Amino acid sequence: ERKRVIIVGYRKDLGKVFTPPKPNLYKPTLKDAIWSLRLSKPALDKNYTNGDANLAAPNHEYMTGGFSTIYMSRNRVRSWEEPSFTIQAGGRHAPLHPKAPKMLFIEQNKRIFVPEQEHLYRRLTVRECARIQTFPDDFIFKYHNIADGYKMVGNAVAVEFARQLAQVIYKDIILSSDSVL
């Protein structure tokens, strides 16, 4: 949902003008991205990593701990059929897993978890956030504290987006000239 500005420029002597790839109008859903991921684990005490040997998939662990008043001021749950919220560079702000029901509106800027369903509310794992950012499952994030994993994923440019830009640049610069560099 957050807008981004990407600037691509070519040297004048190349005589090229960057034309961005056509936008993909399909918006992948949470089901598309993370449905197949199962058996997540909470982080260890103080949000230290479990280590990949103890996880069903690399980095498939989630931050534990409370939620701030600001976090609880909005619904943080999207359904399986919706695209994810923007992945931010911090685990405390990670979206909640779609298995949980939408948060209940109490009053302006105040929501709560559905009573007797609180056990369903957990943050997305680092791996789930990475999948949403289109990282392949064999890309391993190395960290001791899980907050650093969320930070790496949230600060990253989505892999598929970067790939599409790189393909255009490669075609324009590398494939169309013998001596570019």
How should these model regions be labeled?
Residues 4-181:
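S-adenosyl-L-methionine-dependent DNA methyltransferase catalytic core
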Residues 1:
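Short acidic, glycine/serine/threonine-rich loops at helix termini
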